[in-house]
Swiss-Prot record:
It comes from Populus trichocarpa (Western balsam poplar). The chain crosses the membrane at residues 19-39, 71-91, 101-121, 151-171. This is CASP-like protein 1F2. It holds the Pfam family CASP_dom. Coiled coil: none annotated.
Length: 181
Protein backbone atom coordinates (compact mmCIF):
# COMPACT_ATOMS: atom_id res chain seq x y z
CA UNK A 1 0.00 0.00 0.00
CA UNK A 2 2.84 2.37 0.78
CA UNK A 3 4.34 1.71 -2.66
CA UNK A 4 1.13 2.71 -4.38
CA UNK A 5 0.89 5.88 -2.31
CA UNK A 6 4.53 6.75 -3.06
CA UNK A 7 4.13 6.10 -6.81
CA UNK A 8 0.97 8.17 -6.91
CA UNK A 9 2.54 11.15 -5.17
CA UNK A 10 5.65 10.92 -7.37
CA UNK A 11 3.55 10.92 -10.55
CA UNK A 12 1.85 14.14 -9.64
CA UNK A 13 3.81 17.35 -9.23
CA UNK A 14 3.50 19.03 -5.85
CA UNK A 15 2.24 22.30 -7.37
CA UNK A 16 -0.64 20.53 -9.13
CA UNK A 17 -1.52 18.72 -5.91
CA UNK A 18 -1.55 22.00 -3.97
CA UNK A 19 -3.79 23.66 -6.59
CA UNK A 20 -6.18 20.73 -6.46
CA UNK A 21 -6.34 20.77 -2.64
CA UNK A 22 -6.77 24.56 -2.65
CA UNK A 23 -9.63 24.37 -5.14
CA UNK A 24 -11.28 21.61 -3.10
CA UNK A 25 -11.00 23.66 0.09
CA UNK A 26 -12.34 26.80 -1.61
CA UNK A 27 -15.31 25.00 -3.18
CA UNK A 28 -16.20 23.30 0.11
CA UNK A 29 -16.16 26.66 1.91
CA UNK A 30 -18.43 28.08 -0.82
CA UNK A 31 -20.81 25.12 -0.42
CA UNK A 32 -20.94 25.67 3.34
CA UNK A 33 -21.61 29.39 2.92
CA UNK A 34 -24.25 28.94 0.20
CA UNK A 35 -26.02 26.17 2.11
CA UNK A 36 -26.22 28.13 5.32
CA UNK A 37 -27.25 31.33 3.48
CA UNK A 38 -30.06 29.41 1.81
CA UNK A 39 -31.09 27.88 5.12
CA UNK A 40 -31.09 31.22 6.93
CA UNK A 41 -33.15 32.89 4.18
CA UNK A 42 -35.71 30.10 4.22
CA UNK A 43 -35.98 29.68 7.99
CA UNK A 44 -36.58 33.41 8.47
CA UNK A 45 -39.00 33.65 5.55
CA UNK A 46 -42.48 34.79 6.56
CA UNK A 47 -44.92 37.48 5.55
CA UNK A 48 -48.31 38.61 6.86
CA UNK A 49 -50.79 40.58 4.76
CA UNK A 50 -54.26 42.03 5.28
CA UNK A 51 -56.72 41.56 2.42
CA UNK A 52 -60.12 43.10 3.07
CA UNK A 53 -59.99 42.52 6.80
CA UNK A 54 -58.64 38.98 6.48
CA UNK A 55 -55.16 38.51 7.87
CA UNK A 56 -53.19 35.94 5.89
CA UNK A 57 -49.69 34.77 6.53
CA UNK A 58 -47.13 32.79 4.59
CA UNK A 59 -44.38 30.89 6.36
CA UNK A 60 -41.79 28.43 5.11
CA UNK A 61 -43.01 25.86 7.64
CA UNK A 62 -46.38 25.61 5.88
CA UNK A 63 -44.67 23.87 2.96
CA UNK A 64 -43.03 20.46 3.42
CA UNK A 65 -40.95 21.16 0.32
CA UNK A 66 -39.43 24.30 1.82
CA UNK A 67 -38.78 22.48 5.09
CA UNK A 68 -37.07 19.66 3.18
CA UNK A 69 -34.86 22.17 1.35
CA UNK A 70 -33.91 23.82 4.64
CA UNK A 71 -33.07 20.55 6.36
CA UNK A 72 -31.20 19.29 3.30
CA UNK A 73 -29.10 22.46 3.30
CA UNK A 74 -28.34 22.07 7.00
CA UNK A 75 -27.14 18.50 6.41
CA UNK A 76 -25.13 19.51 3.33
CA UNK A 77 -23.48 22.40 5.15
CA UNK A 78 -22.60 20.28 8.18
CA UNK A 79 -21.25 17.34 6.20
CA UNK A 80 -19.34 19.69 3.90
CA UNK A 81 -17.65 21.06 7.00
CA UNK A 82 -16.75 17.51 8.06
CA UNK A 83 -15.33 16.77 4.60
CA UNK A 84 -13.39 20.05 4.74
CA UNK A 85 -11.76 18.92 7.99
CA UNK A 86 -11.04 15.51 6.44
CA UNK A 87 -9.47 17.16 3.40
CA UNK A 88 -7.32 19.50 5.48
CA UNK A 89 -6.12 16.73 7.79
CA UNK A 90 -5.59 13.97 5.23
CA UNK A 91 -5.25 15.75 1.89
CA UNK A 92 -2.10 17.66 2.72
CA UNK A 93 -0.26 14.58 3.94
CA UNK A 94 -1.25 12.07 1.31
CA UNK A 95 -2.43 11.95 -2.27
CA UNK A 96 -3.81 8.42 -1.95
CA UNK A 97 -6.56 8.04 -4.59
CA UNK A 98 -8.64 5.99 -2.14
CA UNK A 99 -9.22 9.14 -0.08
CA UNK A 100 -10.51 10.91 -3.16
CA UNK A 101 -12.87 8.02 -3.86
CA UNK A 102 -14.30 8.49 -0.37
CA UNK A 103 -14.70 12.21 -1.09
CA UNK A 104 -16.33 11.36 -4.43
CA UNK A 105 -18.96 9.18 -2.74
CA UNK A 106 -19.49 11.82 -0.06
CA UNK A 107 -19.89 14.64 -2.58
CA UNK A 108 -22.21 12.53 -4.74
CA UNK A 109 -24.49 11.81 -1.77
CA UNK A 110 -24.59 15.49 -0.77
CA UNK A 111 -25.21 16.55 -4.34
CA UNK A 112 -28.13 14.12 -4.59
CA UNK A 113 -29.62 15.43 -1.35
CA UNK A 114 -29.43 19.09 -2.34
CA UNK A 115 -30.73 18.24 -5.83
CA UNK A 116 -33.83 16.67 -4.28
CA UNK A 117 -34.37 19.71 -2.07
CA UNK A 118 -33.91 22.11 -4.98
CA UNK A 119 -36.31 20.15 -7.17
CA UNK A 120 -39.01 20.05 -4.50
CA UNK A 121 -38.68 23.74 -3.65
CA UNK A 122 -38.62 24.73 -7.33
CA UNK A 123 -41.88 22.89 -7.99
CA UNK A 124 -43.71 24.47 -5.06
CA UNK A 125 -42.21 27.87 -5.92
CA UNK A 126 -43.42 27.59 -9.49
CA UNK A 127 -46.86 26.65 -8.22
CA UNK A 128 -46.87 29.69 -5.94
CA UNK A 129 -45.74 32.01 -8.71
CA UNK A 130 -47.90 30.74 -11.58
CA UNK A 131 -50.61 28.64 -9.93
CA UNK A 132 -52.30 25.76 -11.75
CA UNK A 133 -55.54 26.59 -13.51
CA UNK A 134 -56.35 22.92 -14.18
CA UNK A 135 -56.51 22.06 -10.50
CA UNK A 136 -57.81 25.42 -9.29
CA UNK A 137 -54.65 26.36 -7.39
CA UNK A 138 -54.20 30.09 -7.52
CA UNK A 139 -50.93 31.97 -7.61
CA UNK A 140 -49.92 33.64 -4.36
CA UNK A 141 -46.77 35.54 -5.29
CA UNK A 142 -48.77 38.54 -6.46
CA UNK A 143 -49.93 38.93 -2.83
CA UNK A 144 -46.87 37.63 -0.96
CA UNK A 145 -44.09 39.29 -2.95
CA UNK A 146 -41.53 39.51 -0.14
CA UNK A 147 -42.07 35.87 0.80
CA UNK A 148 -41.67 34.68 -2.79
CA UNK A 149 -38.54 36.76 -3.41
CA UNK A 150 -36.83 35.39 -0.29
CA UNK A 151 -37.82 31.84 -1.21
CA UNK A 152 -36.49 32.35 -4.74
CA UNK A 153 -33.20 33.72 -3.40
CA UNK A 154 -32.92 30.77 -1.01
CA UNK A 155 -33.47 28.29 -3.83
CA UNK A 156 -30.91 30.15 -5.98
CA UNK A 157 -28.29 29.77 -3.23
CA UNK A 158 -29.13 26.07 -3.08
CA UNK A 159 -28.66 25.71 -6.83
CA UNK A 160 -25.32 27.49 -6.54
CA UNK A 161 -24.36 25.00 -3.83
CA UNK A 162 -25.48 22.21 -6.17
CA UNK A 163 -23.20 23.45 -8.97
CA UNK A 164 -20.23 23.61 -6.58
CA UNK A 165 -20.99 20.07 -5.38
CA UNK A 166 -21.16 18.91 -9.00
CA UNK A 167 -17.69 20.36 -9.63
CA UNK A 168 -16.41 18.71 -6.44
CA UNK A 169 -17.92 15.38 -7.49
CA UNK A 170 -16.35 15.53 -10.93
CA UNK A 171 -12.91 16.51 -9.64
CA UNK A 172 -12.99 13.88 -6.89
CA UNK A 173 -14.04 11.23 -9.41
CA UNK A 174 -11.24 12.27 -11.73
CA UNK A 175 -8.71 12.11 -8.93
CA UNK A 176 -9.95 8.73 -7.70
CA UNK A 177 -9.44 7.17 -11.14
CA UNK A 178 -5.79 6.77 -10.20
CA UNK A 179 -6.64 3.86 -7.85
CA UNK A 180 -4.57 0.86 -8.80
CA UNK A 181 -6.16 -2.52 -8.20
Amino acid sequence: MADIETKSSQNQPLKTQNIFIGAQIFLRIVVIAASFASTWLMLTNKQTIDIGGFVLDANYSYSPEFKFLSYANIVVGAFSFVSLLFLVLVGRRSSNPTYYFILFLHDLALMSLVLGGCAAATVIGSLGKYGNSHTGWMQICDHFGKFCKRATTSVAFSYFSLVCLLILTITSASKSRQIQV
